[in-house]
Curated annotation (Swiss-Prot):
Residues 34-38 are lumenal. Residues 1-12, 60-78 are cytoplasmic. The keyword Membrane applies. GO terms for cellular component: endoplasmic reticulum membrane; endoplasmic reticulum-Golgi intermediate compartment membrane; ER to Golgi transport vesicle membrane. It comes from Candida glabrata (strain ATCC 2001 / BCRC 20586 / JCM 3761 / NBRC 0622 / NRRL Y-65 / CBS 138) (Yeast). This is Vacuolar ATPase assembly integral membrane protein VMA21. It is a multi-pass membrane protein. One of its GO terms (biological process) is vacuolar proton-transporting V-type ATPase complex assembly. The chain crosses the membrane at residues 13-33, 39-59.
């Protein structure tokens, strides 16, 4: 019983997954290079992870779901 997942959903998920890994690490090591304070580097890396998470939540809520409606159910916009 396979489910057809739209490519835009997969692309969005892959983008935010990569961003969740890369941005905090990039932030941590960049700030670690600029300053020797590990607390600041770690704190801002955690902040970047939260920024990515909030961005994903906003993108998920603003996604247009009418085009993904099952064939048997019509949207109420008619």
């Amino acid at each position: 019983m396979a489910v057809d997942v739209p490519k835009s959903v997969i692309k969005k998920l892959v983008f935010f997954t990569v961003a969740m890994v890369v941005l905090p690490l990039l932030t941590f090591f960049t700030l670690q290079h600029l300053t020797s304070n590990t607390i600041i580097s770690g704190g801002l890396a955690a902040l970047m992870a939260n920024v990515v998470l909030v961005g994903y939540i906003i993108a998920a809520f603003t996604e247009d779901t009418t085009e993904y409606a099952p064939e048997g159910k019509e949207s109420k916009k008619e």
